[in-house]
Regions:
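Proline-threonine-serine-rich low-complexity tracts
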Residues: 1-282
Length: 282
């Protein structure tokens, strides 16, 4: 201060400019994303901050993760922090839920028609394949539903394939397997045989044909065709064996039975006798 005569005096004032105010921070909204999506802020959002003095406060974040109900699910608590040039900071929290609600993609093998002699296991009829957005190895199983066909050995199998990922999401597809029986039984005839005319020509004596088939018990029958021999007691029988399964398929084979008469008659002479010359010798 200076008066009119030029006298002056001074005093000093100290002005301290301080920054004790933390930035104002605004978190991005909580979000639920699929397990295939990125959890980076570019996808889930970034916090914004303003400060009374610092025009560009530093914004950072840290994550704390809690596992979910299955390997592909989790909850991330993302803590955002805004710090100004004077070290003042403020925080806010964002919740990011990582979900797996997408079912696997399942591809069924082609429908197929096969004979009853062929296995219906997947190694023959084909297996379904599955891929998943998060689980690298979804579980693939199947169940069969059988509908009878026109005969016991034929029918239609509806094979329902099921793919399940680690989070329990499932998808299904159906494969149709038609089982046909167009194959006749395999029949084996008994050996050809020659018997004496005194022997029985019934199968219990001459042998019986055997048969195998999809049908566990094909019916085996026979018919005979007889040709006379050189004498009344001799003949040749052609026995045609027929095996028929439950689906009506049949096969045949022939057995030859020769009926022979090669045994001489058994003769019994009367006792020796002495008679008078006047007696008859008849």
């Amino acid at each position: 201060a200076t008066d009119a005569c030029g006298n002056s005096s001074t005093c000093a004032q100290t002005i301290v400019v301080d920054d004790n105010a933390a930035p104002s921070i605004v978190c991005p909204a909580n979000v639920t994303i699929q397990c295939t999506a990125s959890t980076l802020p570019a996808n889930t959002g970034t916090a914004t901050a303003t400060d009374n003095c610092d025009g560009a406060p530093l914004v950072t974040f840290t994550d704390a993760t809690v596992a979910g109900g299955c390997p592909q699910e989790r909850t991330i608590t993302r803590t955002w922090r805004a710090t100004d040039a004077c070290g003042n900071s403020s925080t806010c929290a964002q919740t990011i839920v990582v979900d797996d609600s997408v079912a696997p993609v399942l591809t069924c093998p082609a429908n197929i028609t096969l004979e009853c002699t062929v296995s219906t296991l997947p190694v023959v009829t084909g297996s379904a394949t599955a891929t998943d957005n998060c689980d690298g190895s979804p579980t693939v199983t199947f169940t069969d539903s059988n509908a009878g066909g026109a005969c016991p050995q034929s029918g239609t199998i509806t094979r329902t394939w099921l793919a399940t990922d680690d989070c329990g999401n499932t998808s299904t597809c159906a494969q149709i397997i038609v089982v046909s029986d167009n194959t006749p039984p395999t029949i084996a005839c008994p050996a050809n045989v020659t018997i004496q005319c005194t022997a029985s020509t019934a199968p219990a004596n001459t042998g019986t044909a055997t048969a195998t088939d999809c049908d566990p018990a094909p019916v085996v029958t026979f018919t005979d065709a007889t040709v006379g021999g050189a004498c009344p007691q001799e003949r040749t029988i052609t026995r045609t064996w027929i095996a028929t399964d439950a689906c009506g398929n049949s096969s045949t084979c022939n057995q030859t039975i020769v009926v022979d008469d090669s045994v001489a008659p058994a003769i019994v002479c009367p006792a020796n006798i002495t008679i008078l010359c006047t007696a008859s010798t008849l």
